[in-house]
Amino acid sequence: MEMLQGLLLWLLLGVAGVWASRGPLRPLCQPINATLAAEKEACPVCITFTTSICAGYCLSMKRVLPVILPPMPQRVCTYHELRFASVRLPGCPPGVDPMVSFPVALSCHCGPCRLSSTDCGGPRTQPLACDHPPLPDILFL
C-alpha cells in the first residue's frame, strides 16, 4: 500500500511540475509594457517613455546530430503588427531634428530574427543608460 501511495504521490508531483513549467514561469510571446530611453547627441536631455514591445518565450529546438543536418533556425518573439509613434526631445538646437520614432507593438508572434527590424540579443544590463540627464516618464500605448 505504501508503494502505491508513493507512486501516486510521484505521479501527482510530476504532473504538477510539468503544468507549472508551462505556466507563469515561461510567459509566451506577447506585447508587454516597457520603459525605454531616447536621446540624441546634439540634444541636452534624455526622455524615458513607456510603450509596448514584444517579449516572451518562443519554442526552440536544437538538433541532436548537428554535424549531419544543418542548424535549425531559432525563432524569436517579434512584432506581428505594429505602428510607429514619435517623441519630441526638448531643448534641441536649431537645425537638429528633435523627433525620435519608435515601434509600438500591437501584436506579436514567434518568427525568424530579422536584424533589419529586431534586436535579437538577450536582456540588457542597463536598458535605460543615457549620457544626458533624464526627464520624467511619458506614456505611449
Curated annotation (Swiss-Prot):
One of its GO terms (biological process) is G protein-coupled receptor signaling pathway. Glycans are attached at residue 33. PROSITE patterns: GLYCO_HORMONE_BETA_1 (PS00261), GLYCO_HORMONE_BETA_2 (PS00689). SMART domains: GHB. One of its GO terms (cellular component) is extracellular space. Keywords: Disulfide bond, Glycoprotein, Hormone, Secreted, Signal. InterPro entries: Cystine-knot_cytokine (IPR029034), Glyco_hormone_CN (IPR006208), Gonadotropin_bsu (IPR001545), Gonadotropin_bsu_CS (IPR018245). It is found in: Secreted. Its main location: secreted. The keyword Repeat does not apply. GO terms for molecular function: hormone activity. Disulfide bonds join 29-77, 43-92, 46-130, 54-108, 58-110, 113-120. Residues 1-20 form the signal peptide. CDD domains: GHB_like. Belongs to the glycoprotein hormones subunit beta family. Heterodimer of a common alpha chain and a unique beta chain which confers biological specificity to thyrotropin, lutropin, follitropin and gonadotropin. The beta chain can also be formed by LH beta 1, LH beta 2 and LH beta 3. Promotes spermatogenesis and ovulation by stimulating the testes and ovaries to synthesize steroids. The LH alpha 3/LH beta 3 heterodimer was shown to have potent renotropic and weak gonadotropic activity. This is Lutropin subunit beta. It comes from Ovis aries (Sheep). The gene is LHB.
